[in-house]
């Protein structure tokens, strides 16, 4: 089943012609293998990625590679427009989906969002909201690290960490996490951190058991 699901996902990625999604997939797979300590598999995957990247540069497997320059130029235009909006509303931002209000005002490229998770967050919620989100995420990451230390649901923790890495990597060129489907999927996986979430008391009980 897992192999079938992976193949379906790979076919979907190829049909979408999304280079950033493919890059995110390969990088998160590398991160997963490294965390699991599978260095040989990680090395093999790295070599496979290098071969695929070389093949993609020919434009035969991935025709969209020929339009990379135009796509990157469009991204630069979108990011520049977002930065102008951030500069004018730095403190509290302009609310959700703010880019749709910004691009007409600054004659920017017309699209739905800033195509960058970090810029879009600042544009929507400003420095105040961005800092609040940052510190909340930091707190959750600390909890996740503690769960690793006391070996609480390790496989689930790895899944959460890899998905978080995918959000950050793909967030460099898109804001897919804000979509309903992907956002709900991430939250569903993230709820696994609620299993035995009192890490300190769990660690203390484990310590007491080792003493006795």
Residue ranges and their predicted role:
Residues 16, 32-72, 80-88, 96:
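A membrane-periplasm/extracellular boundary helix in multi-pass inner-membrane enzymes
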Residues 159-212:
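Transmembrane alpha-helices of multi-pass inner-membrane enzymes
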Residues 62, 66-80, 84-125:
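Long extracytoplasmic/lumenal interhelical loops at the membrane interface
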Residues 2-33, 62, 125-127, 175-177:
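Helix-loop-helix junctions and helix-breaking kinks within/between transmembrane helices
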